[in-house]
């Protein structure tokens, strides 16, 4: 056995032991060391970079590590085997997805405006903002020798007087508290309850003098990013908001790699722990700590995620999803409780899940569709959720059709050499001067934050600017020379947005021809899915009245740039609307409003699912879309006209 020491830039270390020949990335995973590996350790992405500080490794040479970097000790963890005791440095950029959990500043009106707008819109559509949770104050006669009724029956009798229900359930967690709370309060208590027409469930019990807030948790589990809000269930007020990288990402950037990993011995538990123990629970703790809110007072949770994430969250085998005929274990389920999956809130908290529509169109889309309001408008609208799985819904108040395309993780920074989530240090907007080829960019974070990488919106801007200024051609190849354009000894071109001395990372922030090619395929998947779905309905893009774009890829997408690269159709820009993380907003509405929850189930039931792989023309559409903006430039007249003017 050899000792493997993982050192971090903050000075901390983690030690593990491994056998000769063990893969370094697998050793890191076993030691719970977070190293970003979107390609699941296939050597394709180049993101699992570590620096050899002592000892030896048997490492394969790779195009992702230059000779200069190799001589400085840089290696890919997935391409390295243990041969002796070794110490490696794990740079912050390699574990950024985990280390950069962020609790939002709710003093900013922008953070809550989108939720308030969504509440107003669904309420205007006749959906009441009410739910089944309540606080009931109960006063009981104290026991005596003449009244020896046990505590639980005494409470049940009092509650039944308040609401004439036949079935009242008091769980073990409340039963444990009952003797002390009743006597300390002199039998005057407040109960947190869930009431239906037939029964009541008692979640908690307090002294009647206490102020009791009913907490609720809405969570969007994205393949790359997890976002959550903690709310007051009675008022709908957002108490705290947080986001973090999905801890599962070290097992692969896409759902297929995650499913494959889950089939290994102990795999389902590893994937479930990565998203719950390593991601969601720390987010809960941090949100509650920031506002001094008891975690045990979160009594309800709503999860919105794609179909695969739903299964992995629940610890259910997802393997049938990747094989024909692509059958999930469930589309809808209401049988989960916090204690079932290890969510560290009230153990009896009920977990509701936004319903899935198909094997690759999940609850995140039904929740987002609720927010988009296309179901309440006569105009034809298109809803697009930009994530690792690109999902679309088209329709109006009469019909809706959905489909999914495998866009890959590029929109959230995956498959891009300097890609990252939209967190501190991410370049989220960029322009390039045509004459000087010099960039001007905006970085996520406080003023003065140095760039570390590119998030989705920044990638869109950079590629658009490179194309519109003639630095790259429609194939994404560099055709102009300059200080920031360079080619390696293999001939691969790249453009440097921030040199190492300008950046907050250990290398230049750049975008390569391989990155551009990966992104062209991602945007091509979106555009070809739009064309295929519209063609199946005999619709033309000119018939689209509004396009609602969702996804946590930055503070907002420059819609003009998205059209320039051929990701969205060439229609008037005023038709595009960015609605942020609609999955989280929809989960919030479902959590706060039982009628909104019911409406979401109705939307899922009434939506037609189009399986793109069964459409003969889809692959032709995809191949045609893998140019900037498209092989058929007549589809993008305004883009070609503007490029000529520049």
Region spans (language model):
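Nucleotide/phosphate-binding catalytic cleft detector across ATP-hydrolyzing
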Residues: 66-72, 76-218, 223, 235, ...
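N-terminal phosphate-binding loop and adjacent alpha-helix
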Residues: 247-289, 415, 426-431, 518, ...
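Catalytic phosphate/nucleotide-handling subdomain of diverse soluble enzymes
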Residues: 396-398, 539-603
